[in-house]
Amino acid sequence: LKKSLFLVTFLALVPLFLCEEEKREEENEERQDDDQSEEKRNLVSALIEGRKYLKNVLKKLNRLKEKNKAKNSKENN
């Protein structure tokens, strides 16, 4: 009777352990997916900010270029 009780208990616990292991693996995968999604969002945000900064730099350079053109044309006249 003890052997059969042990066997039944063992056979009941094996699937439980397997389910727990599978659950942990799924949680790890979800965490990795969340981390990757966050990294992508951060990268996109950084690219957008970099684009804005570059756009402002180009505007300032164009203004300086126009000022230099105006200055040179006044000097030539």
Swiss-Prot record:
GO cellular component, one term: extracellular region
InterPro entries xref list: Frog_antimicrobial_propeptide
Pfam family name, one: FSAP_sig_propep
Task performed by this protein: Has antimicrobial activity.
Similarity comment text for this entry: Belongs to the frog skin active peptide (FSAP) family.
Propeptide: 20-39
Tissue expression remark: Expressed by the skin glands.
Signal peptide range: 1-19
Domain of life: Eukaryota
Main location (coarse class): secreted
Protein localization: Secreted
GO process terms (BP): defense response
Protein name: Distinctin-like peptide
Species annotation: Pithecopus azureus
Keywords in alphabetical order: Amphibian defense peptide, Antimicrobial, Cleavage on pair of basic residues, Secreted, Signal
